[in-house]
């Protein structure tokens, strides 16, 4: 069994990682840290874990963590910067769910995250953990940057079009909507049920931190950085991201459905839906799947791609486990084959 | 007091119309019909009306309805086609909340609504009841076609850009999201709480009936029919539409904020928010307001317009009352000055 | 126009009070204070107020407040204790929405609220503002203690049974459920949408602060303090309280329906529903009504009373305005005749 | 592998049963019937099953079903009456999730379900499938009546008190609240999101069909039929039942916490929470657990028991699988060890 450490497991990505690892056939949580809750049992904070674990939170002790095979960071920005180097130097592999190592350009990172980059010397070895484009690099990686939730949904939706060079990349549009869990388990007025339920709005239109990450990925795929308008919105629900993507086609003859089906035929977690489909977020809730449908409305020159994920699974903890599976030679789907609870 | 008839008041636009008319200072519901519920008190079906009315539903008798000053149709498609002519010939004015008279081209209507147009001879006198572009024609109108909910939110958002000729009209995008009440008070599995809550999806991507209506309005404003990709989505909540609109700017020098503020300065129900705003659907819930914000993200060449309405008020019954006020010489805001209940 | 001051208007009872007073025909908000938000416009914090007021929050200056005819406290416990005395001495009447003056026994208050009572000398003049039992004392009151939300729903439900002496008062049960807005507009993890939606639980079973308040009221009505088991629960929604009340009948011959109808015949805000009804919280949302139904299931010896209110209206701000109307000789229903928005 | 048939798998208990069986280590769905959807793939109706099964619905053919080891009925009342006999006579075991065989008294069943009992001759062999009281009888049973959702939550909560003879059984109160999925996947106006969300109400106060079932179980346990007031309520959420139970203690000296812990110490699916707990429905969502807390508020003479289950799992399909496990000698928890997805 792979011994996994989790730093910062009191948030939503943390408890989701716990859920996945506690049911994983080849790994188990061994050290789970929280500065503020050391000594408390996990299942006292998260009653869904009662009967599944006797672990308690511990102080984030690098020595203890280094005894793990892999350490996950489910922490605010900057924490992995501060701790990853020591763990890596002791031979422990690191899977970071925060944004600390997602952007290759440290200066760009600093600009968007408003603080100096704490570990630019590690950027060279960080692998962006989107298996659908980086699968070959992940097994040998020591340091994985798990993609953000919006970047996962948006990138997977655009990749086939961009790889095939079918669209005008100057004016891509990504209209994305996320459940409230994307904002984390922090006390903030805007995420109260009274504020966020029976309500809908865009936010961060001027510029969201996931924009440079998406541009980096799409640029890698397209060969040059595209022009992208990215508008996130807050959905009155807990889990799920839907991204509706718009691109003007330069080539109207390609069978988009076939293109998508072929691109993702071998991907265990990308499900291209039948023609005419409208993927629902609930169909992937609690699972590591991304469901995608591609449309060309009214036979016009605009492609519409609909992409849904669970922001806490394929958009965070599930993708982290998928990376762990690849890093440790386990079946890629190990521990990730649950069926969405519906309704 | 204006005596108002309502045909088909058992749906959501019907009960909303009742709420507005029962509190209106210059009008009152006089005849309220329902074929299936004749004899039943309104407040037995809608307990929120207890203490506010003693009316009961009656059979839809044209003679009785013709005694009203104005008759509202809150009915499925085709009913107003069948009944409006007789009422008009008897001198009763008609405000139709269905789509029966929204499209000027009867053949186009038939194609989208899948049935022959039942009253093409009345199309000439029908006025599209969007006061923000047709205010002058409404006072003398005998027959008003109340705009659809999506068309109201989308058109009000695009109008300033199109009137000013600032954007490439070949590739407009309208990504719209609606609460479930837009689907009406019909027993259908897809709108059950178990299906529609904690879930999000697009629908009707191939072609939604509101598309030709939007194209007609935007075409009137722009001077030619634009290219528009319109994708509606279903929100896990009751009321509210948010439309996020995308257009590529041909002219980057215009102050968009000033443009929108000036265009709507005299409009009592269009509120242009301060720069950088993200209008929330709840801020207009139960009210006749449309709140709009305009952005140019990252200083790029794409304008993003965010437009919110309550689909049952400005998107249906409130706009119907606004038209009634204009038709009968009442203050345009009469009975429409309520404040949104928040939270 | 009555000039009203509001201390602490940044919470949910505050914004609800603003909504009601801004639409009130005989009163208006004149001074609205907030220590933390002085200088900010009300409609910047609460966009539903845009177009309805130009007021800004000010520092809570007793001098300014004393120029008002009446000052509402929508504050945490203890604030009204500290400020009410000075206002009263200057002739300004006080309507306190907090619990500061609800309990006549200062020692009992201290025990439940965990702090010394800050103004025991004012308790003599405080009138418990439940018009349905205290209507005669309210017009001359200088200091009103607005009842809590649960106490309003529970007391109105039990009063007819207790006044008539029909039930065993040793074992009353009140199973009450409240929307999340009852917890206020405070940043706290437990009230996040992610924690409170799609979830249900009891809380405070060991003892909730509203228990002594309910016991005081029921004791006044029954002539002696009853035995009451009161269990509150948290509903996954914003507004509304439903209380299901259980009492064993000593007398099986009384017509409970008639009893309730007669008791509340003259009450403008208590609506006894027809036999067999199940009142819905949404039917009173945004309104000052309490809807009640009384049942005797299976013809047995247990009475079941179902009572619903909007916790922010009849359970707080609406009842406060009802008291104001009575204190200043206005029609009791002035500004409180809105119809619930449904759906 | 146990070959399972499912009759009527298009409802919510049906799809939940599919989810559980598709992931079950010792059983698999072999025949899945639906009269109205024969020929359609399961995953076309339920997209969460995409990638997990290639099965399609078939006509309910008794011959095909009889080839299964066990057949589950997830059907409206009366269907199992009509078909169970033939299957049993062919040696196929039957697990009925409907109410057809829950009540031992056929006349009583007819009275509550408003139709003649269709198979009274089978009642003798039907075993009420609540393992916590009937575990010994289940392995040899040929016909299992899976308990209703409310009866499961209420009975498990009351059993320890009644078995120990600690309470006055004349005036038990069960105030129960259920998510909307309890009403099934039927098109009905009352269960639309627009009707059931942001709303709460009691229903069926005069008499709910689960009442005689609860009385039968509690009577078995207590030795005589108790007096019970049972009031169900509709929660604005999808899954979960919470039952708050009230009973007057005859004996004040018993340690209720110890009583409950001992009673359920060996039960794999009943989790007695620590003293002072308030179990949340979400902590059992998607799982077969019942979580229970017992309180004696204010040290008084009334016991309050809080019991939560997922109505579709421990209240239906999960309990059905638990019975199957016991019937076929599998580990009782096989396929039922998932962790609730939280948040």
Curated annotation (Swiss-Prot), chains A, B, C, D:
The active site is at 149. It catalyses: N-acetyl-L-glutamate 5-semialdehyde + phosphate + NADP(+) = N-acetyl-L-glutamyl 5-phosphate + NADPH + H(+). Its EC number is 1.2.1.38. The keyword Oxidoreductase applies. It is found in: Cytoplasm. GO terms for biological process: L-arginine biosynthetic process. It holds the Pfam family Semialdhyde_dh. GO terms for cellular component: cytoplasm. Keywords: Amino-acid biosynthesis, Arginine biosynthesis, Cytoplasm, NADP, Oxidoreductase. Its main location: cytoplasm. It comes from the Bacteria. PROSITE patterns: ARGC. Catalyzes the NADPH-dependent reduction of N-acetyl-5-glutamyl phosphate to yield N-acetyl-L-glutamate 5-semialdehyde. Belongs to the NAGSA dehydrogenase family. Type 1 subfamily. NCBIfam families: argC. This is N-acetyl-gamma-glutamyl-phosphate reductase.
């Amino acid at each position: 069994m792979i011994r996994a450490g989790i730093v910062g497991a009191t948030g939503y990505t943390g408890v989701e990682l716990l859920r996945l690892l506690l049911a994983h056939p080849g790994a188990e949580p061994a050290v789970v840290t929280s500065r503020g809750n050391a000594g408390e049992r996990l299942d006292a904070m998260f009653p869904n874990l009662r009967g599944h674990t006797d672990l308690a939170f511990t102080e984030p002790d690098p020595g203890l963590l280094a005894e793990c095979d892999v350490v996950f960071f489910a922490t605010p920005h900057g924490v992995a910067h501060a701790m990853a180097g020591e763990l890596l130097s002791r031979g422990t592999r690191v899977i970071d769910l925060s944004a600390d190592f997602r952007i290759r350009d440290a200066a760009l990172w600093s600009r968007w995250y408003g603080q100096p980059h704490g570990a630019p010397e590690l950027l060279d070895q960080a692998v962006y953990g989107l298996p659908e484009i980086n699968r070959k690099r992940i097994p040998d990686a020591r340091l994985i940057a798990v993609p953000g939730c919006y970047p996962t949904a948006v990138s997977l939706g655009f990749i086939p079009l961009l790889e095939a060079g079918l669209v005008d990349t100057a004016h891509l549009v990504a209209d994305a909507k996320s459940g409230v869990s994307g904002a984390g388990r922090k006390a903030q007025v805007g995420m109260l049920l009274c504020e966020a339920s029976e309500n809908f709005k865009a936010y961060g239109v001027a510029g969201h931190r996931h924009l440079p990450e998406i541009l980096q990925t799409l640029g890698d795929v397209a060969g040059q950085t595209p022009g992208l308008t990215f508008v996130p919105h807050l959905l009155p629900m807990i889990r799920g991201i839907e991204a509706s993507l718009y691109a003007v086609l330069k080539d109207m003859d390609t069978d988009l459905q076939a293109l998508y089906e072929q691109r993702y035929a071998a991907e265990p977690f990308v499900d291209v839906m039948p023609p005419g489909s409208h993927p629902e977020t609930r169909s992937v809730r609690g699972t590591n799947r991304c469901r995608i449908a591609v449309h060309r409305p009214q036979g016009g020159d605009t492609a519409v791609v609909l992409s849904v994920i669970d922001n806490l699974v394929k958009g965070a903890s599930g993708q982290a486990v998928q990376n762990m599976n690849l890093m440790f030679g386990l079946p890629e789907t190990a521990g990730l084959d649950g069926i969405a609870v519906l309704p």
